[in-house]
């Protein structure tokens, strides 16, 4: 294999070296379709395209460089290098990460011009691109124009339908796939789970394991999805289903990866079984992955063990693991539950100064919740005013909840008006405001909120409960 080809394969993860190699390619002329002879032995024809394809893929691996990949493609065309079936998949991924989808449409046009629309790689990438940029119509059109879509193309379309919540169409496509594989099942199960139909996700998983040709080792992504469904299903049998899946994992000797351990900890914690959480955490903590620590810290905080959660966070940082955005959401939530205002504010400040984590909207919302729970409503209001960006409804909602708890109608009035401007269609908001006004004896205002809710056409979410007697609900 030529020297440059070897270098390109080995320098994927070193952007500075790649730029240097790119400069060498340009100065020596080896990026051209017909490079100069006598310098290095090189295959003619496809070699220049190979170089560009490698450079495009390497830049794509660095998510902050989609524009570099697109510029390389423009340079490739300018120098008369003909793109091939391996060029377009990487380009379309870069286009999906770009600010505007227009570059992806231009790449689509280039694929048409090059006669690559019937190529499996290119077609799957086009469907995936349109799904990523939210254009399900174009994804469908691209798929429907295939004379004989293969399994990979159908899996791409199935994934696109699931991502955009069109589960009826996804199920219809899935049922028509006589050659569906684990990827097909995973897409559908994940689609139902992420769209809130947790029961159906579990039913589909049970249907999958009943097949005769079920793979000997389960798919990790599928297991994570179905465990997420068990975690979020509000049903008395959800825990037993989760235990069954855990047993399935053990019986099939599936490796307990960090992601799978995180899903198990989350599932057990949401059903109040901290003992199981601890067992799974102990089995995965040595892997040195932040997500399992985050899950265990969250499990402790969620189950009223906020002090233990903060101790575990200390142990995490002492062990050398660097916390991420999720870690600080969990830690700030634990501080809020314990009303540890000073400690929570200290951790919030240390996010950027000590750990290099830039606070996001979620973190600001956690601080507002921290101050609000402790009764510092004015401080919470002032804190919102100092935010570097406009507070969204989740931040104002945290303050409104605190106003309700502390029966502070003065702040609740102003915060409520702010929230109505942001989310005028949210029925729960009107109900909270009505309760705040009623608690303060402002019956006219309470009636006004009730009337506004009725006139808007929104409906109060219906409450429900069940009683379990034996095996009956």
Show which residues each predicted segment covers.
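Terminal (and in a subset, N-terminal) low-complexity or junction segments at the ends
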Residues: 1-150, 159-181, 187-473
């Amino acid at each position: 294999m030529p020297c440059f080809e070897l270098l390109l394969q080995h320098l994927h993860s070193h952007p500075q070296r790649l730029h240097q190699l790119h400069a060498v390619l340009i100065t020596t002329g080896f990026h051209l379709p017909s490079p100069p002879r006598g310098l290095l032995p090189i295959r003619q024809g496809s070699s220049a395209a190979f170089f560009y394809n490698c450079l495009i893929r390497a830049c794509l691996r660095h998510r902050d460089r989609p524009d570099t990949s697109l510029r390389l493609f423009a340079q490739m065309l300018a120098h008369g290098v003909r793109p091939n079936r391996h060029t377009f998949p990487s380009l379309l991924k870069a286009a999906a990460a770009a600010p505007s989808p227009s570059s992806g449409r231009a790449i689509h046009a280039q694929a048409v011009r090059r006669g690559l629309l019937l190529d499996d790689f290119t077609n799957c990438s086009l469907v995936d691109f349109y799904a990523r940029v939210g254009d399900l119509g174009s994804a469908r059109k691209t798929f429907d124009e295939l004379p004989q879509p293969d399994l990979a193309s159908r899996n791409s379309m199935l994934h696109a339908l699931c991502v955009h919540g069109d589960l009826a169409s996804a199920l219809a496509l899935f049922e028509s796939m006589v050659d569906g594989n684990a990827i097909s099942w995973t897409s559908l199960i994940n689609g139902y789970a992420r769209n809130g139909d947790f029961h159906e996700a579990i039913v589909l998983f049970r249907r999958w394991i009943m097949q005769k040709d079920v793979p000997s080792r389960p798919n990790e992504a599928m297991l994570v999805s179905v465990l997420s469904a068990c975690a979020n299903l509000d049903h008395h049998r959800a825990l037993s289903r989760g235990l069954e899946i855990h047993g399935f994992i053990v019986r099939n000797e599936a490796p307990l990866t960090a992601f799978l351990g995180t899903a198990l900890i989350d599932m057990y914690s949401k059903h109040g079984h901290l003992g199981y959480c601890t067992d799974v955490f102990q089995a995965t903590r040595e892997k040195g992955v932040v997500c399992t620590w985050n899950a265990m810290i969250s499990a402790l905080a969620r189950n009223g063990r906020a002090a233990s959660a903060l101790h575990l966070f200390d142990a995490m940082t002492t062990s050398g693991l660097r916390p991420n955005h999720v870690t600080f959401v969990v830690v700030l939530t634990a501080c809020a539950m314990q009303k540890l205002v000073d400690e929570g504010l200290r951790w919030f400040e240390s996010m950027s100064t000590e750990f290099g984590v830039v606070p996001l909207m979620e973190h600001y919302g956690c601080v507002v919740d921290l101050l609000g729970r402790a009764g510092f409503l004015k401080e919470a209001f002032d804190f919102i005013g100092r935010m570097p960006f406009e507070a969204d409804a989740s931040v104002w909602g945290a303050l409104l909840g605190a106003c309700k708890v502390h029966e502070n109608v003065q702040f609740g009035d102003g915060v409520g008006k702010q929230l109505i401007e942001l989310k005028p269609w949210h029925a729960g908001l009107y109900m909270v405001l009505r309760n705040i006004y009623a608690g303060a004896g402002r019956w006219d205002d309470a009636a006004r909120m009730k009337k506004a809710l009725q006139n808007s056409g929104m409906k109060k979410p219906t409450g429900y409960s069940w009683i379990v007697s034996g095996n009956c609900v």
